[in-house]
């Protein structure tokens, strides 16, 4: 998309923050209007995260206007809201390539720009990293400042509070901006708090406060009275007691869409010592009415027509997604079992649980961004005689690994893990690919791991795992649509048993998961035996021994890291049994996989049918 200087005359003057800081303060509102419109025009043409960025336009402009970035460090939590930041930091003309193969990274990324001081993608990491940067800056002694921007959702995670507790203890110079888009501010409250924020962040108030502390330090009763009086006065208009208790100087809440007032407050706060928290109120989707009214649907969007105010509907005849299949199975099972308890760490819509949460509110728990708690909470439910299901993305299960081992597996508790987004996820890049779950789960004792090849198998495996009471189970399924296979009545599968789909000669393709259609095409061409292994753990050892008697070559196929994955399990078994079979392991390579469409990535990695066939024939030459 070419940049229209006539449509964006103020934004045209700003390629980098250095140029932004040359603008008069009076022109900042106009810049924000143009930046918001440019974001709308760009994302509607290219797809991407949308509503969050619309809500942080004024904050982004104010931060780069006041702080000397990139010398000063600006850390974005998660990064969904950082599109305006990318536009203002030398990437304006490439923003339409975001999330595409070879394009801009979907999140702040260190390799992409000196303004991206921390690569992000998962939530609640900013304050911990920012505190480390602040300590390093103090040791450096050059006056570098550190700012962390975190949302009201991300700040609920335990890691964020751990970091704030540490910051309050060591008292490093750090600003945390809490971007709160869950509330709306009336005009009067907003004006009052904006004025209060400017007073409380000013040098006069800060010096009086610190000076008063020193004078009164020897008079405990008076000091305590003054402290309580200050807290009562501030408590009348600000909800900052929790942050003050953690050792932060709290300012706010203020209107996050008044760029001039925000700049003034930030300028005051830049010189304050110790940990500071600025609480701003914003509107997710600000400036585009459909996104304001439904920010969840407009959080991440495909290409759309801004004039229509609607998102494109799914293609007619498209098969249901695996997430939807899971949600339907939940509904079906809960209707028969009041002890079913479904848990999600803030991924209700993504995991296909929206309708379930409405129909069965007493059996549904959204624990917020708290993956560790989600798993141990499930363990407690299992101890109490209930049947917990943890619905979680593969990439986020990584955050609760110790809980899976310590709180569930060691105790052989019957918790079902419904692992969504297993394998290649696509446009969100390195931080979101589900590349490692089979590897890190396979080594855990007492764990049953299933990999469905289609949506019907997915249902049967969920049913099997749900009724397995000897320990934890995991069903791992991908992002995307099913194959259209017929859904059959639910029944329990025999644990650890695969199915031979095609009988061939010499080569046996052992498929784990939804690459089965590609494997089928290759097996037909090579006259190979094709096995739907179904279980990563336990493996169908009897079937493997039988196949080893009649085949000289095994090819394992999975959308997981080759290192430690399902294929590694096959290798270990063959070596333990001293079976003379050569093995080719096909899966994800030992790299972090960048963004692109799922189809593009599979072709690049040789995981499409042509690539699989090519790798097998070349290996056998």
UniProtKB/Swiss-Prot annotation:
Known EC number: 2.2.1.7
MF GO annotations: 1-deoxy-D-xylulose-5-phosphate synthase activity; magnesium ion binding; thiamine pyrophosphate binding
Annotated cofactor note: Binds 1 Mg(2+) ion per subunit. Binds 1 thiamine pyrophosphate per subunit.
Cofactor (UniProt): Mg(2+); thiamine diphosphate
Keywords: Isoprene biosynthesis, Magnesium, Metal-binding, Thiamine biosynthesis, Thiamine pyrophosphate, Transferase
Listed GO biological process terms: 1-deoxy-D-xylulose 5-phosphate biosynthetic process; isopentenyl diphosphate biosynthetic process, methylerythritol 4-phosphate pathway; terpenoid biosynthetic process; thiamine biosynthetic process
Catalyzed reactions: D-glyceraldehyde 3-phosphate + pyruvate + H(+) = 1-deoxy-D-xylulose 5-phosphate + CO2
Role, per record: Catalyzes the acyloin condensation reaction between C atoms 2 and 3 of pyruvate and glyceraldehyde 3-phosphate to yield 1-deoxy-D-xylulose-5-phosphate (DXP).
Protein name, per record: 1-deoxy-D-xylulose-5-phosphate synthase
Organism: Pectobacterium atrosepticum (strain SCRI 1043 / ATCC BAA-672)
